A protein has these predicted regions:
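HIT superfamily nucleotide-processing domains
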Residues: 1-143
């Protein structure tokens, strides 16, 4: 996908209309045009980054800070909201559909239509040595 084809870049350029919730020098938060629940907001960086590995940590942290503030605002706004999911899908296997990093702020309420499933293996606890082995691999990759 080229930058000209990125819908979020086109929103940032003013080519595609949006309903702004929050705007600063690093991020834009706007209403999702295909909300699973009313009040769903997307927070995007103003610099194109197709995935988290292409986004600087400062901007990523700022996105989550803004997402947290928006989540609290949604709760206070009068929109039906008993809880909030903050969701960021990174990569095709994680169901990322638009390859410009974006954070979903999803209002939740009892009986809404959104279902998050962790699969059949959820609840099966691995052995501690397996958890330790994986933790060591991740810890080593952090350095």
């Amino acid at each position: 996908m080229t930058l000209d084809e990125c819908v979020f870049c086109n929103i940032l350029k003013g080519i595609v209309p949006e309903s702004v919730v929050y705007d600063d020098e690093k991020v834009l938060a706007f209403m999702d045009i295909q909300p699973v629940n009313p009040g769903r907001v997307l927070v995007i960086p103003k610099v194109h980054a197709s995935g988290l590995s292409n986004l600087d940590e400062e901007t990523g942290a700022h996105m989550f800070k803004v997402g947290m503030r928006v989540a609290e605002a949604v709760k206070r706004s009068g929109v039906k909201c008993d809880g909030v999911n903050l969701l960021l899908s990174d990569g095709r296997a994680a169901f990322q559909e638009i390859f410009h990093v974006h954070l979903h702020v999803i209002p939740r309420f009892e009986g809404d239509s959104l279902h998050i499933s962790f699969g059949r293996k959820y609840g099966l606890k691995p052995e501690r040595n397996e958890l330790d082995r994986i933790a060591a691999k991740i810890r080593d990759a952090l350095h």
